[in-house]
């Protein structure tokens, strides 16, 4: 009986003391019904008809109470019946969260689930209060000290309960003042410049919000400043963060101990160098001896040593820098203590997170081979190559040790896939073209194979166009790629009231082979065929020059052309989509070959570079330039449908698509004459045979978007410029009358530049890339077609 009393005291229960063991002819459970009653009966150590002792009763009370499902448990005897009475905790039937915006609802729900607050769990109010407290502490860590988190429990029938987490996030506290103490050599203003957080001032519309995480980053920036300017012993000894009574303002005091400013006297490398002393010693030349000590220089050498060792298989090498201070002379010597560790062999390459992309596709980008020495350079190169595919939002790599082996590892690449496909269906209406229907499907990672497949079509009152494309980047094991297109277009605007009406039927195909030279360079060659049939076109001056050179007769043109294309590509971008570092450049050309009706060639050059301004690559400068030149040969002119135009996203934002270039000059007929005179200057753009474009952009963090989501959106401030001209204008214009020339600009001048400035936004949306831009022309000419707001689906800047 003493044992029974102890159990009652331990578990906060009361129970009738039995005088002696008895046989329970029946067992009754009070306080619950249904499934829970049956579960209790099934868990009891005794059954009806069995003998019940003190220990049995104690075990019943103990086991039910420690299950955590009951607030109270009692057991007693009523005659020959064992009665078990319980007060059950409520079962969670629903969980709701209201008032949150800073913390996503999904993140809060995942945290609730992990802490035992999902539907069907037992409600433990103490744990619920602890959860609310932890959320409130998180809000305080991001500067929202007045945030409230109130857990509300609504009791429902049948022992159920509904949880509501009511949140009031309030606003962040402002940094009211910032004070430094102990800084005798470095001014407070210099230290303040190292910080992102700045005191609130009257001229700041929104003030500066205080956030604990950013404050910690700023403290590290101050430490780095001291360490990189000779103060090798500098320390932040104390920080004092004081809130006002309303918890709306923060006053911060930072105490520092600067110490002496040192020069770097000498540096040496010792330890287990893995037999690579000759390769490691030259790395010390990057240090500036007898100059101000900079910790970042030492860190660079440490990383260079580990990288060099990693290239020879020492993937777990450690480097520790030990300073030797000479305070009298204010100098220090650095000893780099190296432990190369064991030389590692790669057992397997493994991939995680690739639910769409096949392992075999990712393996095509690997340079590290299984069963060979680990090489950190090749492992990193694999990461870079995966990033360049454009299939992934993020790519990370790590080394996993093998149980039971101290010299084997697995190299693991963890990827987060992005949507590489886009689907676009649209219906539009134009005053000239009438109702138009557009549809396109593009998949850059078809069935996870890495192949690109696309089909696009347009149908309106003027005609129909279809284009099928396919590219296989892994056509051979050596990395040779194979691509091709099949296209058809039927265009008829002869019923239009404009001067540019004509009919055109075009179809053809092409195939291209790409050959890698090294990790950054490749070249390609290709063959193509195009058939063009053009009729019912109005007589225009530039078209007429082309027709005369081709010796066409009648109002119709039919051409069969075969062309050879060639080019070189360079790519050092760190990512295939939204790159932040590196250069991409290309030189290319296309020329018709024997058997073609036309004789012409086209040359192009493009280059784009990205240069990060900060460590996190959130601020990036981008510069882009392109040029194109085309001309006929063999006494034949460039076809008028192969000229260049500019305008729109991709060349010159702020101007209508294809609206920049030399204008058409149509023939006028008078006095019943069948021969026209080229006098009618039109706003229609006929294009030129030379083009140059340039763009400079400052890529900035997108407002109201978290850092981890910055790689799915991009915001930029830009300046665009472009010019399209006719290099043969000096001779071409000789066929025009003087009064016409007076009304025309000099189409041969490359200096007729248009320019615009504005803001752009790109989003990798679930339906594909969306591009928006708003631009204002800063250099334009009379009658230019300005289009300030533009957008595109499935494209990029």
Swiss-Prot record:
Localization per record: Cell outer membrane
Keyword Repeat: yes
This protein's UniProt keywords: Cell outer membrane, Membrane, Repeat, Signal, Transmembrane, Transmembrane beta strand
Domain POTRA: 22-89, 90-170, 173-259, 262-341, 344-418
Domain of life: Bacteria
Biological-process GO terms, alphabetical: Gram-negative-bacterium-type cell outer membrane assembly; protein insertion into membrane
Family classification: Belongs to the BamA family.
Biological function: Part of the outer membrane protein assembly complex, which is involved in assembly and insertion of beta-barrel proteins into the outer membrane.
Subunit structure: Part of the Bam complex.
Name under which the protein is recorded: Outer membrane protein assembly factor BamA
């Amino acid at each position: 009986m003493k044992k029974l009393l102890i159990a009652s005291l331990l578990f906060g229960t009361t129970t009738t003391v039995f005088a002696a063991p008895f046989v329970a002819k029946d067992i009754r459970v009070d306080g619950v019904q249904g499934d829970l009653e049956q579960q209790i009966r099934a868990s009891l150590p005794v059954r009806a008809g069995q003998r019940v002792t003190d220990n049995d009763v104690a075990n019943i009370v103990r086991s039910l109470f420690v299950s955590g499902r009951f607030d109270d448990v009692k057991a007693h005897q009523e005659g020959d019946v064992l009665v078990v009475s319980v007060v059950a905790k409520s079962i969670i039937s629903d969980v709701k969260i209201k008032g949150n915006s800073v913390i996503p609802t999904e993140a809060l729900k995942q945290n609730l689930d992990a802490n035992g607050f999902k539907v069907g769990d037992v409600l433990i109010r103490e744990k619920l209060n602890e959860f609310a407290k932890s959320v409130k502490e998180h809000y305080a860590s991001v500067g929202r000290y007045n945030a409230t988190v109130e857990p509300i429990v609504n009791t429902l029938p049948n022992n159920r309960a509904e949880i509501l987490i009511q949140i009031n996030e309030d606003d962040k506290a402002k940094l009211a003042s910032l004070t430094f103490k102990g800084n005798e050599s470095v001014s407070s203003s210099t230290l303040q410049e190292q910080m992102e957080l700045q005191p609130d001032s009257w001229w700041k519309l929104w003030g500066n919000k205080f956030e604990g995480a950013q404050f910690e980053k700023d403290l590290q920036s101050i430490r780095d400043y001291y360490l990189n300017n000779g103060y090798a012993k500098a320390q932040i000894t104390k920080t004092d963060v004081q809130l006002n009574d309303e918890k709306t303002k923060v006053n911060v005091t930072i105490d520092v101990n600067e110490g002496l400013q040192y020069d770097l006297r000498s540096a040496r490398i010792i330890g287990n160098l893995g037999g690579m002393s000759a390769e490691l010693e030259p790395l010390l030349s990057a240090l500036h001896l007898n100059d101000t000590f900079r910790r970042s220089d030492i860190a660079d050498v440490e990383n260079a040593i580990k990288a060099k060792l990693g290239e020879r298989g020492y993937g777990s090498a450690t480097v520790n820098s030990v300073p030797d201070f000479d305070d009298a002379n204010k100098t220090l010597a650095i000893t780099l203590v190296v432990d190369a560790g064991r030389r590692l062999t790669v057992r397997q390459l493994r991939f995680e997170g690739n639910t769409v992309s096949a392992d075999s596709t990712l393996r095509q980008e690997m340079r590290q081979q299984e069963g060979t020495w680990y090489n950190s350079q090749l492992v990193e190169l694999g990461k870079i190559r995966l990033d360049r595919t454009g299939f992934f939002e993020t790519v990370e790599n790590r080394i996993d040790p093998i149980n039971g082996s101290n010299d084997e590892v697995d190299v693991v690449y963890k990827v987060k896939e992005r949507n590489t496909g886009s689907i676009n269906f649209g219906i539009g209406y134009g005053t000239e073209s009438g109702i138009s229907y557009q549809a396109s499907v593009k998949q850059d990672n078809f069935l996870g194979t890495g192949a690109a497949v696309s089909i696009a079509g347009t149908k309106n009152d003027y005609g129909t166009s279809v284009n099928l494309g396919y590219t296989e980047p892994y056509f051979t094991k050596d990395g040779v790629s194979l691509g091709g297109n099949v296209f058809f277009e039927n265009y008829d605007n002869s019923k239009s009231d404009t001067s540019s009406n004509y009919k055109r039927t075009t179809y053809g195909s092409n195939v291209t082979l790409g050959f890698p030279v090294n990790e950054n360079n490749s070249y390609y060659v290709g063959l193509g065929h195009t058939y063009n049939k053009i009729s019912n076109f109005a007589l225009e001056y530039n078209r007429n020059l082309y027709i005369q050179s081709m010796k066409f007769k009648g109002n119709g043109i039919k051409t069969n052309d075969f062309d050879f294309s060639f080019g070189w590509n360079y790519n050092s971008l760190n990512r295939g989509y939204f790159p932040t570092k590196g250069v991409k450049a290309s030189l290319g050309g296309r020329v018709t070959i024997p058997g073609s009706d036309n004789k012409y060639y086209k040359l192009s050059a493009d280059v784009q570079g990205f240069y990060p301004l900060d460590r996190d690559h959130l601020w990036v400068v981008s510069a882009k330039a392109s040029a194109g030149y085309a001309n006929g040969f063999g006494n034949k002119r460039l076809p008028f449908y192969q000229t260049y135009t500019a305008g729109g996203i991709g060349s010159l934002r702020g101007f209508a698509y294809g609206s920049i270039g030399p204008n058409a000059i149509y023939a006028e007929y008078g006095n019943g004459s069948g021969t026209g005179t080229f006098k009618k200057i039109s706003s229609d753009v006929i294009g030129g045979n030379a083009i140059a474009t340039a763009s400079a952009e400052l890529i900035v963090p997108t407002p109201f978007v978290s850092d981890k989501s910055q790689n799915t959106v991009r915001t930029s401030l830009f300046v665009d410029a472009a010019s399209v001209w006719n290099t043969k204008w000096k001779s071409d214009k000789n066929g025009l009358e003087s009064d016409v020339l007076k009304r025309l600009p000099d189409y041969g001048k490359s200096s007729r530049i248009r320019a615009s400035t504005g803001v752009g936004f790109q989003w990798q949306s679930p339906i594909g890339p969306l591009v928006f831009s708003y631009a204002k022309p800063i250099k334009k000419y009379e009658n230019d077609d300005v289009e300030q707001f533009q957008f595109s689906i499935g494209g990029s800047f």
